[in-house]
Amino acid sequence: MGTTGLESLSLGDRGAAPTVTSSERLVPDPPNDLRKEDVAMELERVGEDEEQMMIKRSSECNPLLQEPIASAQFGATAGTECRKSVPCGWERVVKQRLFGKTAGRFDVYFISPQGLKFRSKSSLANYLHKNGETSLKPEDFDFTVLSKRGIKSRYKDCSMAALTSHLQNQSNNSNWNLRTRSKCKKDVFMPPSSSSELQESRGLSNFTSTHLLLKEDEGVDDVNFRKVRKPKGKVTILKGIPIKKTKKGCRKSCSGFVQSDSKRESVCNKADAESEPVAQKSQLDRTVCISDAGACGETLSVTSEENSLVKKKERSLSSGSNFCSEQKTSGIINKFCSAKDSEHNEKYEDTFLESEEIGTKVEVVERKEHLHTDILKRGSEMDNNCSPTRKDFTGEKIFQEDTIPRTQIERRKTSLYFSSKYNKEALSPPRRKAFKKWTPPRSPFNLVQETLFHDPWKLLIATIFLNRTSGKMAIPVLWKFLEKYPSAEVARTADWRDVSELLKPLGLYDLRAKTIVKFSDEYLTKQWKYPIELHGIGKYGNDSYRIFCVNEWKQVHPEDHKLNKYHDWLWENHEKLSLS
């Protein structure tokens, strides 16, 4: 292996070795005359290569061949899974979705030697049947996918032996690569699970830090993987952990050590001193607390509120003493989280009490606005002498004990409709216009309105019965209804369920029954001029009222076919009938 980075790992004699690309590639030792622009261009090229990284399964007929899970350019995690072989010339590709509602789901498809993709076993079977393939069967193609946990465990078993074997060979590499990378990745580097491993990573090579990153990823497991969201900058994926790259920050951090050898040494020393607190801070910002090495696999989720408290506490501690901040953000994360939880609970109780006091003060102020002026004066004097909690209690007690004259309440709240004087009187008749009373002439059409014109309520009830119903069905039920409920006073007090039983031969009997009861009540109580203002009466009922009950047939333009016939007949015979 060269010093340019860990490109691939040999997995022994298990078959074709899958390619495992590190999410962070090592930069070779630059010469002394390396310029600032060259370093920036190299880092940018490395990021683009890693972003477009894809692992595919090789098309060899090896029964022990391991199958890598492909990583799409839009973002899919790469891993390996040990499976049976696929037919010669075919490729099996597995992609995992990282975004959307189906994040974490695996898509399996096979690529034929001709380059055709098959995403389901049915389409593959149709293809084989169409081409007359006899050597291949749909059962030879496996569309199932192992779980991510199983894939990780197999990858760990296959790769850890090779990782430990190459660990000794990489320990003699230069420390400049590690320090350069820790400086460039200051904002995005994930720390080891304990302070002892962090000290070991300083002395080891770049490969050692990559090994520690792989161990950390096993502790995080599927929790971080399912929380992947597309960031604004470039993102490289290493076993499901998103690492955001900021080119500007990387170039800015690299600008200090590429000018001269003396400055490079000072920056490297500074990177060693700052690597631990910066790594801990980036870990806290990711809202995942990784416990000590003894409790591997357990993760502590940090909420957004706790994260804000952590930031505030770090600022205060850093202003006081740097030693205290490093001690708080180092390996003792469990104690820090417990202290942080207690502080969060205290602050939450304080804010809750403050919000309660503010809410009670607002209620008391609103209630006091309705009190008499002398009560307000006494209440304000007592409020000045009392504490905030006793102020609220005193204001509520005054509001409950002191009484206001009944006349003021009636004058303010009670309307004229509900006053006692109005209730003692009988129901006032509707104040209609002083229409000219007239008797509509009998026509050859024999409409029911010609019989009920003398009682507007009965005529309007008939229009409700005839609405979207034939006269043969509605008129017999109408006479039964008028026998049981002869007036509006009786109908307004009737139970709508009884009326509904009577109207069952007609459609919409429940709706008609409720409409009749409410219409009868408004007919007696509401001040109306035309019946279209009442509940349940439309244009048909209003036109019938104006033609048969009121002498306004000349101003009416009916739309009902029966009313149209009667209206036309009136216009043709109004001179013979001496109608004005």
Curated annotation (Swiss-Prot):
Interacts with MLH1. Residues 1-36 are annotated as: Disordered. SUPFAM superfamilies: DNA-binding domain, DNA-glycosylase. Gene3D superfamilies: Hypothetical protein, domain 2 (1.10.340.30), Methyl-cpg-binding Protein 2, Chain A (3.30.890.10). Its main location: nucleus. The modification Phosphoserine is found at S318, S428. It is linked to Tumor predisposition syndrome 2: An autosomal recessive condition characterized by predisposition to develop a variety of tumors or malignancies, including acute myeloid leukemia, myelodysplastic syndrome, colorectal adenomatous polyposis and carcinoma, and uveal melanoma. Melanoma, uveal, 1: Most common intraocular malignancy, arising from melanocytes in the iris, ciliary body, or choroid. Metastases develop in more than 30% of case patients, almost invariably in the liver, with poor prognosis. Residues 76-148 form the MBD domain. It is found in: Nucleus. The active site is at D560. GO terms for molecular function: DNA binding; DNA endonuclease activity; DNA N-glycosylase activity; pyrimidine-specific mismatch base pair DNA N-glycosylase activity; satellite DNA binding. One of its GO terms (cellular component) is nucleus. The lineage of its organism: Eukaryota, Metazoa, Chordata, Craniata, Vertebrata. This is Methyl-CpG-binding domain protein 4. PANTHER family: METHYL-CPG-BINDING DOMAIN PROTEIN 4, METHYL-CPG-BINDING PROTEIN. Mismatch-specific DNA N-glycosylase involved in DNA repair. Has thymine glycosylase activity and is specific for G:T mismatches within methylated and unmethylated CpG sites. Can also remove uracil or 5-fluorouracil in G:U mismatches. Has no lyase activity. Was first identified as methyl-CpG-binding protein. GO terms for biological process: depyrimidination; DNA repair; response to estradiol.
